[in-house]
């Protein structure tokens, strides 16, 4: 099937998807969960082929870790689907109700975006999370995963499509693209596709934006920071730093740079290094850091690097203002944390750091749709428009205005025969 037909089919299916009941969608989600478990052997075999091929092609270790889709990860995504089913139905929610006049009522109501094209890295679990979120939100989805996972993605897409069509979803609601040429062709299909979500480097996201007329929701690098303030609880700071860096290194919310206030650096860094050494973390540092602990010399490139590995860069700063300046210069707008006992400083940091997720005394690894209670996420948006931070169900919704009248015409108001009331109502659209 060519890409134009794939996109056209999704456009047709989007009309039916928008009208599906919550019951039908939840039943389809349950069918996906059952099908993943029933086909786990076939899925793991396909994934093993991808892993073996990628190892021969010398794929980096962190990327191999992302690529692996074993029984544990299958069970994890199944649990994620069940959590998604437990969330309330997102479509048809009344966001606002205004009484314009007697028997003239305006409702702002949630609805699907339509057809979403999502380009993501070599993480098969992401394919399941993305497709199920789109299903729950009533959207059609066109998927392009990393080529390293091509066999796994084919099997997963087939399993999901077969299970959901049997459950009553329209054919064509999900589609898989397999090449860069497919992506370039998809970017031209603005008559069918309503939104593109690219997950990858800043350069990649910029390329997508520059080569498409379709709106783009950016998901770029995760250059995350922890700043240890002079008033921090240093034991807490150590725990947060180690968790932020090492709990799972191959993800975009892992910390890459640690900023330490000069006033506590000599007391804090030796103990931190001992903990990082236990995890075999490679440490790069500026000259001041090197005077305190043994590190490799850091360059400007280190401050701008998303390692996705057991590597961290450390810089000593004069205080919070310098830390914020560093984050503004080198950060990606993803997740940044301050560790401090000083509430005023924490509030100031969270207000001034212009990232989608800003934390006080908590690991950067918390910036995740599942951990936020969103069910799952299609990615972390570093854009400021429409959706920001972990993009869950709410980020995949639009809204429409529904006006319910009884023969009213504008001329009556223009000639002062009638007057607008413009009263806020505590009423839902399904109560009309």
Curated annotation (Swiss-Prot):
GO molecular function: glutamate-5-semialdehyde dehydrogenase activity; NADP binding
PROSITE patterns from the UniProt entry: PROA
GO terms (BP aspect): L-proline biosynthetic process
Signal peptide span: none
Localization in the cell: Cytoplasm
UniProt catalytic activity: L-glutamate 5-semialdehyde + phosphate + NADP(+) = L-glutamyl 5-phosphate + NADPH + H(+)
Keywords assigned: Amino-acid biosynthesis, Cytoplasm, NADP, Oxidoreductase, Proline biosynthesis
Gene Ontology annotations for the cellular component aspect, listed alphabetically: cytoplasm
Keyword Cytoplasm assigned: yes
InterPro entries per the UniProt record, alphabetical: Ald_DH/histidinol_DH (IPR016161), Ald_DH_C (IPR016163), Ald_DH_N (IPR016162), Aldehyde_DH_dom (IPR015590), G-glutamylP_reductase_CS (IPR020593), Glu-5-SA_DH (IPR012134), GPR_dom (IPR000965)
Source taxon at top rank: Bacteria
Pfam families attached to this UniProt entry: Aldedh
EC number(s) reported in the record: 1.2.1.41
UniProt pathway: Amino-acid biosynthesis; L-proline biosynthesis; L-glutamate 5-semialdehyde from L-glutamate: step 2/2
Similarity comment text for this entry: Belongs to the gamma-glutamyl phosphate reductase family.
Function according to Swiss-Prot or TrEMBL: Catalyzes the NADPH-dependent reduction of L-glutamate 5-phosphate into L-glutamate 5-semialdehyde and phosphate. The product spontaneously undergoes cyclization to form 1-pyrroline-5-carboxylate.
Protein name: Gamma-glutamyl phosphate reductase
Name of the coding gene: proA
